Amino acid sequence: MRNVMQAATLESKFPILAVEHDCIISKDADITVAYKVELPELFTVTRNEYEAIHSAWAKAVKVLPNYSIVHRQDWFIEENYTPDIQRDDLSFLSRSFERHFNERPYLRHTSYLFLTKTTKERSRTQSNFTALTRNFIIPKEMQDKDTVTRFLESCDQFERIINDSGFVRITRMRKDEITGTENSAGIIEKYFSLSQEETTCLQDLTLGAAEMKVGDNCLCLHTLSDTDDLPGKVATDMRYERLSTDRSDCRLSFAAPIGVLLTCNHIVNQYLFIDDPAENLKKFEKQARNMH
């Protein structure tokens, strides 16, 4: 019986060209710097602290050059808690606390941040116009050494602003953490296997009209990009009624319903595209004149 399924190697479709100087280089010459994000403990952040965290992110984003992309990726994977009771510095109460939560299911939250420098043309292309299906020419802007240097300097400034806030800490990821080694998986391998485990074995990818699978995991993808689908009112945080009382508030992030409150394995990707504000202002003014 002849196999009618189309198959291709991952290498032929891979959008990444190389990882050099701890930066990810795409086949379109986009440059990406990756960070591991450490967030505050759940239910420990107040409303004022959420405002301060939001202000720090907004301040950091403003130092990035035009035509940059900020990509925040949050993993929520169901696991059973494994206590660490072999440590010598644990007290009797601490050891009892660890045993109390032994093998209890929970969502393990892992967060990454990716800062990408692209070009005006690349930032406005559609998802079906990629290096996977078309030939490409390296943009002249991305061949300019000063452009790359300024972007890397802005990334360092971005990192300092976030870390100086005192609430969130980001740590630059090195080449081995991105690509992995013989004994440990990098973020690329983890993403392609939909796992945070230290396994270097990739899963089969199945792309069909009815479903998409990675190994034994079936995927369901949702996109939220239309303003009509967004809430009428947004804020940095919200009141979590289940743990709040008349005298005290328990606050969660405004995006918690698609984050920690969504009780299944899932990944949340958030993208912020930084355009040229001066060019956009001229475009809006022209549209306003045409309307009158």
Regions from the PLM with identified roles:
Residues 1-292:
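Extended, folded cores of ATP/NTP-driven motor/assembly subunits in large transport
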